[in-house]
Amino acid sequence: IIEYHGTLFAAWYNCEEKELIGPTPIRQKRSKDGGKTWSDIETVAEDQTGKILFCPPVYGICEDKLYMLINEMVSADHIHALDLYVFQEEKDCFEFLWSKPIPFKLNTNVYKMANGKLLLPGRIAELDGFPNTPAVLISDSGKIDDDWRLVYIQENGDLPDGSKLVHPEITAIIEDNKIAMFSRDDERKVPLVYLSQDYGETWSDAFSYDIPFSDSKIYAGTLSDGRN
């Protein structure tokens, strides 16, 4: 979900049978009254053959343009491509820009950092493989439709105690050059946090923390009054 020019945009992957089985079109609604009422459903991307699964949609705003990034998958969580769409206000719809063979699983909206660069948290795999390694994409130009550079948060999906990361879905709190990146940890069911002091270029080892949390998605954010 994101706010753009006074409108809330909310998008999801619509599993018509069960999660990531069969067609998974990306659908969207809009609200012009702060979420009290919503528009009819719009379809942004779909493959009715079910050969390509879409998941998940995330948003970003750059140079006053609204973008949506979507993963293509060949099976559940096996990443085939990263797709980019831009919202055309004059046409009142999203239009496809490009698709690149980047096996990076999205999780959060685009973050703009204090150094002008953009950050996308997620997890990486081999092409058409399962992403079990936390990583970030960085846009050095600060533009969403430009090249993105991959930075590993850790070398692979192995933890020091011998357990393995399964779905290391990550989310960030950013303050100037400092980033706290929170990660799901399925096997131990103890959430992890990684720290960066240089805008996501290098990362600490994983720490455990005491926020009650299980093996499910986690999202962080900063409110308008500065609270995280």
Name these PLM-found stretches.
Residues P56-P57:
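Charged, often glycine-rich, active-site loop that binds/positions anionic groups
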Residues I2-I52, I61-S216, T222-N228:
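Beta-rich carbohydrate-recognition and catalytic domains
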